[in-house]
Amino acid sequence: MDAIVLWLREVFLEPSVTQTIIILSLVCALGLQLGKLRIGTISLGITFVFFVGILASHFGVTTDPVMLTFAQNFGLVIFVYALGLQVGPSFFPSLKKGGIAQNLISLGLVLLTFLLCILLYYILGISMPNLMGIVAGATTNTPALGAAQTTLHQINPDATAEMAEMALACAVTYPLGVVGVIIALALLKVMMPKVEERDDSEAPKAFFSEYEICNPALDGKSVREVALLLKRPFVITRVWHNGKVEIPTSDMILYFGDHILAVSGEEDTSQLEILFGKREMKDWNRPDIDWNSVDKQLVSRRLVITRPKLNGVRLGMLKIRNLYGVNISRVDRAGVELLPDRDLRLQLGDRLTVVGEGKAVERVAEILGDEVKQLDNPHLTTLFGGLVLGCVFGMIPFYLPGVSMPIKLGLAGGPIIIGILMGAFGPRFHLTTYVTNSANLLLRQFGIILYLGGLGLASGANFFDTIIHGDGLLWVGAGFLITMLPTLLVGWASIKLLRNRYDGTAGMICGSTANPMALDYVNSQLKGDGASVVYATVYPLSMFVRIIFAQIMILIFA
């Protein structure tokens, strides 16, 4: 019996590498199970992992500190990098369609947070180092805490006690920082539910429309010549001549009275109607369109790009229409239909809808690859290479005018920026950054859960003592105010005054507060990745500004 007790103590209580893995796994598993509980319509989800870690640490569970720090930081790096890869392809298009405005709103939230912090500094008399710890916890921004501690240490190398208090203030306010944003987002959704019904995608979508050629100037011109007349991207996918449907080539001649089916951006249909003469009212975008019946003698197949050498190649360089007499009517990328423009850069995993004669479609399938099983093979070289670049980039010091100490983005800021760049531009350099949706979700969930479990175990030992005794309750109250007030004000203004969608506003708030747990809550409530795209759009700049502001506040008020 004694041997069993000693063995159990060794496995669960004595800090070691194995014991840390066991405890961390137990905390994560129990937290995930509790995260399924709902209070009304609100569920904290994976945030429960953090609270279970705090409870375990409070009741005396200790782990190997080195292992715990590694697990926590490695989980954070995996999460932010995978998030960057996910939203990378749509990140820069989103900047052109509202991203700059979202960043300005996000900066307004950051500025309001620090103005409130200055106000509390004079009203409550809390020291600025402790306030920076409170702000770091209330906005779940641990890199800002690290930057403030570094600045304080450079000002006063003997400020060890103050630095420890800053970390404790962060730990005490962190839970309500997580929960407060989730509560604020839930309140915004309840108060303004109708905003959810509006939908306009950040990504360009393919829109089908039929036209009759009534413009005499087009009679006898080739498809290539007609395409040059309009400075907007569109593709003629089918031509009806004398009642017979054909797949057009660039040299096909169009005649007065022909009917054509074109794919373009929806906003360009009015210009196409002016060009061709008359637009038919039939809705070609209905999901119940029987394309096989439309094409009759033609074959329509969805082919998947699995040949690595095509990664990053422009669609027009393949010359599929002219060489094989087939037409590409759709390009599906991660569930988003893109306009099959000749300048579109193809990516591994893109699904192309190809229409033409059976044998020609088969030849195109051989060129594209169309072997779905190949997509299941992970491209780990690019994955780990991106992690290396992200961590290195996060350690690069940036020197700003008027700030004596260098600024670093750290493990939270560096990897997400590199992930975005890899996802957006990797294919142009023939880097295979494709990750299946399920694999990307696994990486993100695994990373953030590991981070939360480690953070809870690391910060829970003195959590309740600090709340009950000393200034703990004051810190908690100040932190909750810093979390809720700017979030509700900016969120209300974004939705009500600026007429932004809820998912974009929620993603902006999560990114501005560096709150991936709240982002996970939002994603569990909504369809699509609109919130994740906006999160990654505003996260780098808001993170950078918060780090700078934290250091400036210490320099001015400490």
UniProtKB/Swiss-Prot annotation:
One of its GO terms (biological process) is potassium ion transport. Pfam families: Asp-Al_Ex (PF06826), TrkA_C (PF02080). The chain crosses the membrane at residues 15-32, 39-61, 76-95, 104-126, 166-188, 383-405, 409-426, 446-468, 473-495, 533-555. It is a multi-pass membrane protein. It is found in: Cell membrane. SUPFAM superfamilies: TrkA C-terminal domain-like. It comes from the Bacteria. GO terms for molecular function: monoatomic cation transmembrane transporter activity. The keyword Transmembrane helix applies. Belongs to the AAE transporter (TC 2.A.81) family. PANTHER family: K(+)_H(+) ANTIPORTER SUBUNIT KHTT (PTHR30445), TRANSPORT PROTEIN YIDE-RELATED (PTHR30445:SF3). This is Uncharacterized transporter PG_0562. It comes from Porphyromonas gingivalis (strain ATCC BAA-308 / W83).
